[in-house]
Amino acid sequence: MTTVSEALKAFRDSGAKYLDLRFTDVKGKWQHLTMDGTVVDEDLLNNGVFFDGSSIAGWKAINESDMVLKPDLSTTVMDPFTAQPTMMIFCDILDAVTKEPYERDPRGTAKKAEEYVKSSGMGDTVYIGPEAEFFVFDDVKFQVEMNKSSFEIDSAEGPYNSAKNYESGNLGHRPGIKGGYFPVPPVDSAQDIRTEFLEELKNLGLRMEKHHHEVAPSQHELGLLFDTLLKQGDGIQLYKYGVHMVANSFGKTATFMPKPVKGDNGSGMHVHQSIWKDGKPLFAGDGYAGLSETALHYIGGIIKHGKALNAFTNPSTNSYKRLIPGFEAPVILVYSARNRSASCRIPVSDSPKGKRVEVRFPDPTANPYLAFAAMLMAGMDGIKNKIHPGDASDQDLYELSDSEVAKLPTVCGSLREALEAVDQDRAFLTEAGVFTDDQIDGYIDLKMQEVYDLEHSPHPVEFKNYFSV
């Protein structure tokens, strides 16, 4: 554990002129407060900094707004994008009066989830491996007004630009619909920017493995190596920040929206998960696909609570434009070895250490701390109550008829449905106080505002379908 004096020395030795206090709001957006280096001392690092919590959506009311940003001294990293040398540090949120962890702090929830596994005796380490996909565009415009609503995206890779007149000429090399996985350049025009993504993410302290073009034009993925749950929550925040900043430096813009384009694949965030104890993987065994009973029960918990999990793993109205048949989205709550159409997949591994469960329905609009913690709690409920997931489904689920699909459990069809599901199925989350009822109620209220916003807004497709009726 890093001491206050060690952290202060590291800050001064780094040459940083500023300390950027980073924290995550309920929706998963990274926020920050920058301190001048001349005021950074042991007292600040030990006691934190007061701030106005009422300005953060879903947190405290203005009459009880004081909160504390408490630095986690083990999480310092230099920001490679600032003009002046700046050190970033992750912060936890404390109540200003009690100095206790604030129960709506997402990072605090992730910490409690890890502690729950340890205190249960079922394991001591939770490993997470997220695969966050994203799009990179050249230009994006959108507006939502009383009398007009529209968006327009543009990318040189877009098949809609095959006849466009460019000043330098239209060279023609671009992936078609569902054609991005994965030809070499010049069809793949993003080799250099993806390499730069990887380099800067390594500069941010992340352990990177690979990069590649994804299925849709302008869509990409960077391989982030697995780590413990809390560290991967931090890692996804660094990942998103790095992608946004590098894209900006190239004069482009990146988005983690699940479905920004019509008629092609959306962006998911498949999450690989495993539990270990005493240095041994608990998911390896001699059952189906080399799984242990513990792993099967973990899957059982994920499937049982799948609809409630959607509130955290797929927390945007846009999420459910991705979770539809026909675009490689896993909408059926079953499990399988190798079968990528299942919502829970067992990846091939030659080693027991690599035995894990891949949950495929999450997307990168998720708050990583809440999503990872919620899936862990669902899996732990499955282990605790020995919830068996039933037989595996090794057939291509995309080929099933509507009547066959109707007999199988599926993910939610809308954010409203997901919020209603977690409202009714929350006991597994509140076990040992990992999540609290107040936290879940506040989350539902906040996300329902997004539901209302969409449901109360006329859509251009409605004009196309109904204006002349």
What are these language model-derived features?
Residues 1-469:
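Glycine-rich, acidic/polar active-site loops that bind/position phosphate-bearing ligands
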